Amino acid sequence: MTCQSLIYQLIVLTGKKGWVLASFCSEEAEILYQLQGVNKVIGVKFEACTGISQSRLELLTLLYHADEISQSDLQKKVNIDSAAVTRHLKQLESKGMVSRRRKPEDNRITLVRLTDQGRERIESSKKEKERFMKEMLANVSAEERRLLIDVLARMRNNINNIEA
């Protein structure tokens, strides 16, 4: 759905043509709408293509580069809330991809490590992830990719600086 079709629907629903045009027809609104659309579909398509969610793959990748790490340190590195990390790790553990144990010196700390099966999953996911990214960025030139990276980084910085 484009901004224009969204505007039409809002005009029909609200009967407020002037407000809708001012609020939803701006270039900024179209950018926000497109970003939200990409955000909605990218996770679903990524998981369908790779067989694993981006969050779980990120956790496995971090563990791939660490021998063993505390669950709280892992949570800080991925910037996902602790309950979500726990859920992800429980599912990964049930699939044999990670193992968790209590730290002997401090039973409050849970240590996490990648299993051999998890290591194999990371290695097999690399090709799937590369294929997904290649298809996602088809018809986007190298120059456009560099520009997109720059623009998104600046937008992320701007968003982080917004006072709530």
Curated annotation (Swiss-Prot):
Keywords: DNA-binding, Transcription, Transcription regulation. The keyword Transcription applies. InterPro entries: ArsR-like_HTH, HTH_ArsR_DNA-bd_dom, HTH_MarR-typ, WH-like_DNA-bd_sf, WH_DNA-bd_sf. GO terms for molecular function: DNA binding; DNA-binding transcription factor activity. PROSITE patterns: HTH_MARR_2. Residues 71-94 bind DNA. It comes from the Bacteria. Residues 28-157 form the HTH marR-type domain. This is Uncharacterized HTH-type transcriptional regulator YdgJ. Gene3D superfamilies: Winged helix-like DNA-binding domain superfamily/Winged helix DNA-binding domain (1.10.10.10). Pfam families: MarR (PF01047). The gene is ydgJ. It comes from Bacillus subtilis (strain 168).
